[in-house]
Amino acid sequence: MDHQLTREESQRLMHLLKLPMEQYGNFPLMRKAFLRACKIVHPDKGGSDELSQELISLYRRLEESLPCLSTQDFIETDKVCLIEKIDYLTDWINCNFENCNKCLYCRLWNNHKSDPPFPKVWGYCLCYKCYIIWFGLEPCHFAFQSWMQIIALTPFCA
């Protein structure tokens, strides 16, 4: 990840994509916004050449910094899909201290702990703790609800 964007570049990219910073790392949504923004800022459509080049440059650098996704990077959905309703969090106390391993929160946290010890990046690790660290949020109900919405819209490999 040696071409990773700085915080200012990430904020600039999200501004150009017209997306809130909370959606940084939601790559399918960012891709759609990028394609839409390219049509708007393209010089042939009345946009600025500098703005178009900046958008493409930032987005290309972001894509280059993404790790290659393999089947090992995904949780196994056959275990999750056996449950009709996915439990995001079984019990806050049990999930934080005993690791119930039944809810999605614990499965992602266990995946976080089992990965190699290099620095974790939101988008590579989808656990709640990486989410709040990456976005600089305080652990609270609003942050948890926001994380759940992003996880619900994230496609997982089956």
UniProtKB/Swiss-Prot annotation:
Q: Which organism is it from?
A: Murine polyomavirus (strain Kilham) (MPyV)
- Mainly resides where? host cell
This protein is called Small t antigen
Instruction: Say yes or no: keyword Transcription regulation present.
Output: yes
Q: Which domain of life is it from?
A: Viruses
Q: Does the keyword Phosphoprotein apply?
A: yes
Every copy of the J domain together lies at 12-75
In this UniProt entry, the residues modified to N-acetylmethionine are 1
Kindly list the ranges of residues that form H1C3-type zinc fingers according to the record: 112-130
- The record places its C4-type zinc fingers at 95-106
Q: What is its biological role?
A: Promotes efficient viral genome replication by accelerating both G1 and S phase progression of the cell cycle. Inhibits host PP2A by binding to the A subunit, thereby displacing lower affinity regulatory B subunit. Inactivation of PP2A in turn results in the transactivation of cyclin A and cyclin D1 promoters. Late during the infection cycle, ST may induce dephosphorylation of host MTOR, leading to the inhibition of cap-dependent translation. May establish and maintain high levels of viral genomes during persistent infection in cell culture.
Q: From the Swiss-Prot or TrEMBL record, state where the protein is found.
A: Host cytoplasm; Host nucleus
For this UniProt entry, the molecular function terms from Gene Ontology, in alphabetical order, are: zinc ion binding
Q: How does it assemble?
A: Interacts with host PPP2R1A; the interaction inhibits PP2A activity.
* Origin organism lineage: Viruses, Monodnaviria, Shotokuvirae, Cossaviricota, Papovaviricetes
Keywords attached to this entry = Acetylation, Activator, Early protein, Host cytoplasm, Host nucleus, Host-virus interaction, Metal-binding, Oncogene, Phosphoprotein, Transcription, Transcription regulation, Zinc, Zinc-finger
